[in-house]
Amino acid sequence: MRAVIQQVKLPDTGRIIAISDVHGNLLARLQLRDEDTLVFCGDILEKGRYSLETLRYIMRLASERRVLAVLGNCDFWQDAIYRPTPGSDEYCKRYLLADSAGWGPGLLAQMCQEAGFDMGRGMDMEEFRRVIGAAYAPEFRFLESLPHVIDTEHYVFVHGGLPEGGHEDWDGWKCMKNDNFLGQGRSFDRWVIVGHWPVTLYG
């Protein structure tokens, strides 16, 4: 899948606040002002019981303020609904029946619970996609609208990191999941703002 790159002109005033892996209450502490630009550098979902609530909150925030977002490797569920493969169906079923490594039900499981869709080992994945895709079309459209990279005059925002080579050849997945990007020893002509890799792992 080719990387989607969005060109953005940032305003000259206000703070530019970039956050990633929003598995906490940071937003409440930011005290956002009207002139601020909030950039989500991916992984707005998963690792908690409030993925659906968080997604809706960010969608609402994006309709009220200047909010930008890129896809992270934990946000990429629209393909499971719109472009499934036999492999993705199996992965999706295992994910739905698991406990997200102890974090509780993830986004799709939360959608199933809210919609009253029965998740069992014998569930029909085609029916799952039909029911959940229809019930949560606005949420999937929002995720579908997110780029892998936001390119601005002074900053590049990406979840995992920028792959090697020219941007026309970048793979979207490698933008979302690019472990230890800082440790790759590369340099750029602008600040590259990433998430994904916990700061403690760079120590």
Language-model segments: residues:
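Acidic, histidine-bearing metal-coordination/catalytic regions of metal-dependent phosphoesterases
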Residues: 1-18
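A generic local structural motif
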Residues: 2-6, 27-29, 55-56, 143-145, ...
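Short, flexible hinge/linker loops that cap or flank conserved catalytic cores
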Residues: 9-11, 32, 184-186
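Short coil/turn segments at beta-strand junctions that form active-site/ligand-binding loops
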Residues: 14, 34-37, 65-66, 148, ...
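Core catalytic region of metal-dependent phosphoesterases/phosphodiesterases
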Residues: 15, 19, 24-100
